[in-house]
Amino acid sequence: MNGNPELPTDTADQHWNKIWNNLEKGSKWLMPEPDVERWAKGLKAGSAILDLGAGVGRHALALNSAGFDVAALDAAPGGLAEINRAGPEVETKLGRMDQLPFTDACFDHVLSWNVIYHGDETIVLNTISEVRRVLKPGGTFLLTMLSKRRLRIDQKNLNGPREISRNTWVFDENSSDKIHPHYYCDAIEMLCLFQGFEVLWMEDREHEKPGSWHWHLILERRA
């Protein structure tokens, strides 16, 4: 491993800010995920929800339209600008996922779709701790993580794979966010990350692209 502990690893927002600033109409990034819609149907109307890593607001805006009290946080200002234009009633915050600018236990639920694995293990652990801090006891956390099934495929198909720290990989792919650190884990490693949470649902499956294995989880914050 040749990582430099002095360099930040949660840098993928640099890539995504460029994407958000040049987003085309009809992009898949404007369409909410079915998993999120199903999860939301089981939540109490008016619940306070944090969309952590909201991007251009595909979930924050849909949740707001469904009657929830939504806050959207992202480190990429381009995405938040899109949310402000489309749904000014959604509270937007520019910030880092491991330093959430919210008070303790202020959200009933938290959503983070394809977000918190952008960084090394320290970033991931600090982010999980922050989510637990802002989430009310008994509240749920819907999220995805990168599976090590995906790592084997990425190592084969992407250029210059390098493990810069434990389970944290970068690739020489200038047109992809994979040039920035990504954290991959198997089931045991992942469950060890989520101290203070109960697992309600967990599944390792592909997204729309073959080989794009992600863990899908719904967790409950323990008291």
Model-based region annotation:
Residues 52:
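Conserved beta-strand/loop positions that form the S-adenosyl-L-methionine
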Residues 98-110:
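A short acidic, Gly/Pro-enriched loop at the edge of an enzyme's catalytic core
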Residues 117-119:
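A short His-aromatic
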Residues 125-137:
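A short glycine-rich, Lys/Arg-flanked "PGG" loop and its adjoining helix->strand segment in the class I
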